[in-house]
Curated annotation (Swiss-Prot):
Heme b b562 binds at H83, H182. PROSITE patterns: CYTB_CTER (PS51003), CYTB_NTER (PS51002). Keywords: Electron transport, Heme, Iron, Membrane, Metal-binding, Mitochondrion, Mitochondrion inner membrane, Respiratory chain, Transmembrane, Transmembrane helix, Transport, Ubiquinone. Gene3D superfamilies: Cytochrome Bc1 Complex, Chain C. GO terms for biological process: mitochondrial electron transport, ubiquinol to cytochrome c. It is a multi-pass membrane protein. This is Cytochrome b. The keyword Nucleotide-binding does not apply. Heme b b566 binds at H97, H196.
Length: 379
């Protein structure tokens, strides 16, 4: 009799995706982040569900309801901090996952890469709306500043902003709709993840060498299931250390002050994972220009498959490209630091230089270096 996992319509899908899936034998720990992102999404949906049971999306009671969760609900403080810091872990895994894709040339799987970029945008939108929900000072002013950016769109800008706000300022209507969107988007993300995996399994995984690995495949289970469990345990360990020892390390103290439209915080800044984009936004002294640069900083990921001029797929055997890649990483860390600094000398000029370098490396230097490497190898 054939095994049920190979015949049952539902089990068959699971079997082909997680058990009998042929996987390259040499994929490194950098390939763990896909499963870790799945784990992060699961943690966020579960903790978010329990938070939603006690949260009220009304301007009068939102802040109090979060306080109530932390003080009165059984382990409410734990659920809330796992959710808040889980978002940080989510973005750490996201950035490492994208970085892996760039380094090893995984972006040559067009559909998988493009769905991944859509996922990145949707996760960023979800995180932004989630940050507004506690209705602290930084929630309110962050929502005001970021939604206001849409007013830079010519002709329809102001109408669009007021339509999103549901009034003439960020108020009850805004909070209610942000809660609704924040609740629904993770399920849309889950659907997109399935599409992402569907396209990935059409081609199979890439591997560190960037070479075709059809001649050397091993079953996903037990080899990579065990490897993924190790990654999951380490992720949970780091998350719980963060949650139990310094839950507010990555947060902003201003968000412990209830939202007050009459008093602006001295430094309005988003959560750490948006700081690089925020720095690029601020480095251009024009509203529309800044917004375009902000969107371009993520959309530029779409250009990687088009600008891949090297004869090799992976950067594993391309030392010059490796150097430029790590300079790009350092540049992004610099932008993240600048995004959290006040708008004054010398931070303004550092931010502008880092922003220029970011776009220059991706659009000019990396393709040029690829061509030089081709020449050096007489290809």
């Amino acid at each position: 009799m054939t095994n049920i996992r190979k015949t049952h319509p539902l089990m068959k899908i699971v079997n082909h995706s997680f058990i009998d899936l042929p996987t390259p034998s040499n994929i490194s720990t950098w390939w763990n982040f896909g499963s870790l992102l799945g784990l992060c999404l699961t943690i966020q949906i579960l903790t978010g569900l329990f938070l939603a049971m006690h949260y009220t999306s009304d301007t009068m009671t939102a802040f109090s309801s979060v306080t109530h969760i932390c003080r009165d609900v059984n382990f409410g403080w734990l659920i809330r901090y796992i959710h808040a810091n889980g978002a940080s872990m989510f973005f750490i895994c996201l950035f490492l996952h994208v970085g892996r894709g760039l380094y090893y040339g995984s972006y040559t799987y067009f559909e998988t890469w493009n769905v991944g970029i859509i996922l990145l945008f949707v996760v960023m939108a979800t995180a932004f709306m989630g940050y507004v929900l506690p209705w602290g000072q930084m929630s309110f002013w962050g929502a005001t500043v970021i939604t206001n950016l849409l007013s830079a769109i010519p002709y329809i800008g102001n109408t669009l902003v007021e339509w999103i706000w549901g009034g003439f300022s960020v108020d009850k209507a805004t909070l209610t709709r942000f809660f609704a969107f924040h609740f629904i988007l993770p399920f849309i993300i889950t659907a997109l993840v399935m599409v992402h995996l569907l396209f990935l399994h059409e081609t199979g995984s890439n591997n560190p060498s960037g070479l075709i690995s059809d001649s050397d495949k091993i079953p996903f289970h037990p080899y990579y299931t065990i490897k993924d469990i190790l990654g999951a345990l380490l992720l949970i360990l780091i998350l719980m250390i963060l949650v139990l020892f310094s839950p507010d390390l990555l947060g902003d103290p201003d968000n412990y002050t209830p939202a007050n439209p009459l008093s602006t915080p001295p430094h309005i800044k988003p959560e750490w994972y948006f700081l690089f984009a925020y720095a690029i936004l601020r480095s251009i002294p024009n509203k529309l220009g800044g917004v375009l640069a902000l969107v371009s900083s993520i959309l530029i990921l779409l250009t990687f498959p088009l600008l891949h001029l090297s004869k090799q797929r992976s950067m594993m055997f391309r030392p010059l490209s490796q150097l430029m890649f790590w300079i790009l990483v350092a540049d992004l860390l610099t932008l993240t630091w600048i995004g959290g600094q006040p708008v004054e000398y010398p931070f303004i000029i550092i931010g502008q230089l880092a922003s220029i370098l970011y776009f220059t490396i991706i659009l000019l230097i990396l393709p040029a270096v690829s061509l030089i490497e081709n020449k050096l190898l007489k290809w």
